[in-house]
Amino acid sequence: MAFGYDTITPEPVAKLIDEFNRLPGIGPKSASRLVFYLLRAKREQSERLANAIMAMKDSTIFCNRCFNITVEDPCTICTNANRNERQVCVVEEPLDVVALERTGEFKGLYHVLHGAISPVEGINPEDLRIRELLARLRVEPIEEVILSTNPNLEGDATAAYLAREIIPLGIRVTRLARGLPMGSDLEYADEVTLGRALQGRREM
């Protein structure tokens, strides 16, 4: 049970604390605060939260082209005629797309891998959307692939693997500049730092 509430907390409350505690970035104390806030809140607020979660699960899908989250397929970025279809920025997660869009620097398309290569965690290239990326590169007029994986061991390993696969196709491959701290995640970078990393990208 959650955070030592086995005997003093009613089971429905303890179960919800457990569920919040399973979410990334939410520890036992934060989970408890959220649940006890909802206990004090009006019923309508709890219902709105529950309905929003279910609506998100029911209506959100992955774009069949770039694998970003969307409510329509293909997504609005892939169907935007003003985007530069000759550039593709490869990221690990949908949150990285949000971070890069906030910079206002990138006007091309995206490809979301949904993870990074990590032998320790048992994540291999075939577990990611790499096969789909290579298929896109063979049929779309892409001239540059910007590898925007996180600046950590897993991100670097993924970028190196992708570069080995893509360069023989005759496509330019670049990597974000090292303005980002080692071990950080793109989603937490501020817009200025991320924008400069994009502008200063280097050849691989």
UniProtKB/Swiss-Prot annotation:
The answer to whether UniProt assigns keyword DNA damage to this entry is: yes
The UniProt keywords, alphabetically, are: DNA damage, DNA recombination, DNA repair, Metal-binding, Zinc, Zinc-finger
Between which residues do disulfide bridges form? none
Which residues does the UniProt record annotate as the domain Toprim? 86-181
| Zn finger region (C4-type) | 63-78
Gene3D superfamilies given in the database record: 3.40.1360.10, 6.10.250.240, RecR Domain 1
Q: Do you know which InterPro entries this protein is assigned to?
A: DNA_Rcmb_RecR, Rcmb_RecR, Rcmb_RecR_Znf, TOPRIM_dom, TOPRIM_RecR
Q: Give one GO biological process term.
A: DNA recombination
* Family per record: Belongs to the RecR family.
Protein's name according to its UniProt entry: Recombination protein RecR
Q: Which organism is it from?
A: Herpetosiphon aurantiacus (strain ATCC 23779 / DSM 785 / 114-95)
